[in-house]
Amino acid sequence: MNPVQQPAQQRSPASSLPHPKRAQEAPDMALYCDNFMYPQQSLHPSQRGPNFAIGEYTSPANPYLWLGGHGVNNAPNYSPSPAPYMPPSFGAPQRQFLPNSPAFGGTELSWMSAASQEELLKMVRPPYSYSALIAMAIQHASDRRLTLSQIYQYVAENFPFYKKSKAGWQNSIRHNLSLNDCFKKVPRDENDPGKGNYWTLDPNCEKMFDNGNFRRKRKPKSDANSAKIAKIGEDHLNPKGKESPPMITPSSPEEPSPTGHSKSPSPPAVTYTPCLTNFIGSMTAVDAATANRQGPLGLLNELSQRNISSLSSFISGSAVDQSAEHPDTSLFYNRSPYYSSFPTTAQKQPQFLQQPPLYQGRY
């Protein structure tokens, strides 16, 4: 730092005279960061010691704790009076903040010098929920029960933060008492005069309160929900109890047969729809039309006679059995066949089905 220039009229005549500088001399003005030394006036070499070491300065009785230094030193052997621009309270003893106490872990907060321990408690909100404060107050009571006003009193006395505004946190405490299942209301006895009921802590919830951490007890589920969940679990464990619906169902519901004799039920896969019955009937009509004709397709006629005749015999037997189930199936047999009889002569293919000739033009 540059030395502070002093006015000419404040200097003594002896200090205004030029003196030769020596290598071992200390500078006229210096600032020691460790000791917060303020600049001093220039003195004659005969008035100061030959060497000034830092260890020679005495430390004050009450240091500045947040810097860990030696504090401001107003050594009378170095300067008879402080500089006029320094405030008189700069080197005044400071009050130590937060004495050693196990609650704050020794001098962890000793670097703060703005307020005392009580002022800190008023500024900082306690790290406890309202339910924890209520449980703490009830546990500290002699008979483990307190009224609402006694809970207010305990919170305000032990936590000065809540002394500032009482309306807000008192409403929160009332809501926690009424909504939390761990707090039980106990009516007053007849011989106990006073106003208001007592509040106590549920014995099942006492273990849940541990060092200010209060976990709210959940309400048990209703019996209906538990029974429903148990039923769903049984259904998943025993899937064989349920019967799966058949993969193939008949086209129409089965009705009791008018005939007295009993018959064996047919499997679902053999049930025929009206569309299939109509198709087989049309094929039977085609077989009847081609049986009286002679054409070049002899092998085809023979195969068709064999296959369709067997189908017709099977249909004739099944149609009698299904006459009661499908009374309108005769309409399908009376219809004209979908396909006409096989042609006796070969027909010419349409032009769009014929293979196109190769392109004979020039490329």
UniProtKB/Swiss-Prot annotation:
Task: Note the SS bond partners.
Answer: none
Q: Which GO terms describe its biological process?
A: cell differentiation; determination of ventral identity; ectoderm development; nervous system development; positive regulation of DNA-templated transcription
Query: Which Gene Ontology molecular-function terms are recorded?
Result: DNA-binding transcription factor activity; sequence-specific DNA binding
- Region (Disordered): which ranges? 1-24, 210-269, 344-363
Query: What residue range is the signal peptide?
Result: none
Cell compartments where the protein resides: Nucleus
Please provide an example of a Pfam family that matches this protein in its UniProt record: Forkhead
Keyword Ribonucleoprotein on entry: no
Its biological purpose is as follows: Transcription factor. Essential for ventral specification of the early cephalic (head) ectoderm during gastrulation, playing a role in the 'non-neural' versus 'neural' cell fate choice. Binds to DNA via the target sequence 5'-[AG]TAAA[CT]A-3', with 5'-ATAAACA-3' being the preferred binding site.
**What protein name is recorded for this chain?**
Forkhead box protein I1
